[in-house]
């Protein structure tokens, strides 16, 4: 067989293959290719938009850290501050077994007394002069208002070495039973939180206390929801 005949046979075979490709299956295959192309194009466009507008991709490290710190319990955040600065820090919680009084615990999980802070006679003792953040939270609960108004008080007081008298630094009054009319409604439980906080210039040896007029209404259902603390700034 001559070379020209061989080339001619190859050309005829190619023409036959092209003719078969343009047969009944040709339009179907073209349609599939077109659909596949558009799907890939749409997917690429969607991915670009998501990356461009920040819907997906690496998260901001600072924002993630702030969110994580916001979820930390109070004592963990206080402990973090203490570790970084080595300044006086105190965070104590109430004794749930103390009947009829608000008694702060010195040795318990989630209690922190560091860098000179101490709890003496149910009072936090300041070890050095400076600015301090003072805070406290009480949570009250009751089964009913007993058909009469109820005024709950929460105070944080200071006794300084320079003058041996108690002075209120922070105070608040709340009533869970306002406008109660005798026999006007059925008994229903109530809950009332009171949070206090402020920054003060304190002196070495100052004694701080947190009290309430109705300790019998304190809610100890959850550990750590009644607390008292001081942080040096």
From Swiss-Prot:
Homotrimer. Interacts with SPPL2B. Residues 57-233 are extracellular. It is a single-pass type II membrane protein. Its main location: membrane. Residues 88-233 form the THD domain. Disulfide bonds join 145-177. The lineage of its organism: Eukaryota, Metazoa, Chordata, Craniata, Vertebrata. The record marks 39-40, 49-52, 77-78 as: Cleavage. Cytokine that binds to TNFRSF1A/TNFR1 and TNFRSF1B/TNFBR. It is mainly secreted by macrophages and can induce cell death of certain tumor cell lines. It is potent pyrogen causing fever by direct action or by stimulation of interleukin-1 secretion and is implicated in the induction of cachexia, Under certain conditions it can stimulate cell proliferation and induce cell differentiation. Induces insulin resistance in adipocytes via inhibition of insulin-induced IRS1 tyrosine phosphorylation and insulin-induced glucose uptake. The TNF intracellular domain (ICD) form induces IL12 production in dendritic cells. This is Tumor necrosis factor. GO terms for cellular component: cell surface; extracellular space; plasma membrane. It comes from the Eukaryota. A lipid is attached at residue 20 (N6-myristoyl lysine). The soluble form derives from the membrane form by proteolytic processing. The membrane-bound form is further proteolytically processed by SPPL2A or SPPL2B through regulated intramembrane proteolysis producing TNF intracellular domains (ICD1 and ICD2) released in the cytosol and TNF C-domain 1 and C-domain 2 secreted into the extracellular space. Pfam families: TNF. Residues 1-35 are cytoplasmic. It is found in: Cell membrane. The keyword Secreted applies. Belongs to the tumor necrosis factor family. GO terms for biological process: extrinsic apoptotic signaling pathway via death domain receptors; immune response; necroptotic signaling pathway; negative regulation of protein-containing complex disassembly; positive regulation of apoptotic process; positive regulation of canonical NF-kappaB signal transduction; positive regulation of extrinsic apoptotic signaling pathway; positive regulation of JUN kinase activity. PROSITE patterns: THD_1, THD_2.
């Amino acid at each position: 067989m001559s070379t020209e005949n061989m080339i001619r046979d190859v050309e005829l075979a190619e023409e036959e293959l092209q003719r078969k490709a343009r047969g009944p299956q040709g339009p179907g295959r073209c349609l599939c290719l077109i659909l596949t192309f558009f799907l890939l194009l749409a997917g690429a466009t969607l991915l670009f938009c998501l990356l461009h507008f920040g819907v997906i991709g690496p998260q901001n490290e600072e924002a993630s850290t702030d969110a994580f710190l916001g979820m930390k319990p109070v004592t963990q955040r206080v402990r973090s501050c203490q570790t970084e600065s080595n300044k006086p820090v105190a965070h104590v919680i109430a004794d749930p077994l103390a009947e009829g009084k608000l008694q702060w615990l010195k040795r318990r999980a989630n209690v922190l007394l560091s860098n000179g802070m101490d709890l003496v006679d149910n009072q936090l003792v300041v070890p050095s002069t400076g600015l301090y953040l003072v805070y406290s939270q009480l949570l009250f609960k009751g089964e009913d208002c007993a058909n009469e108004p109820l005024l709950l008080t929460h105070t944080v007081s200071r006794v300084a070495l320079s003058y041996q008298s108690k002075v209120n630094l922070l105070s608040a009054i709340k009533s869970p039973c306002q406008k109660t009319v005798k026999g006007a409604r059925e008994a229903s439980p109530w809950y009332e939180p009171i949070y206090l906080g402020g920054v003060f210039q304190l002196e070495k040896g100052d004694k701080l206390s947190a009290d309430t007029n109705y300790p019998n209404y304190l809610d100890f259902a959850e550990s750590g929801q009644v607390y008292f603390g001081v942080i040096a700034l």
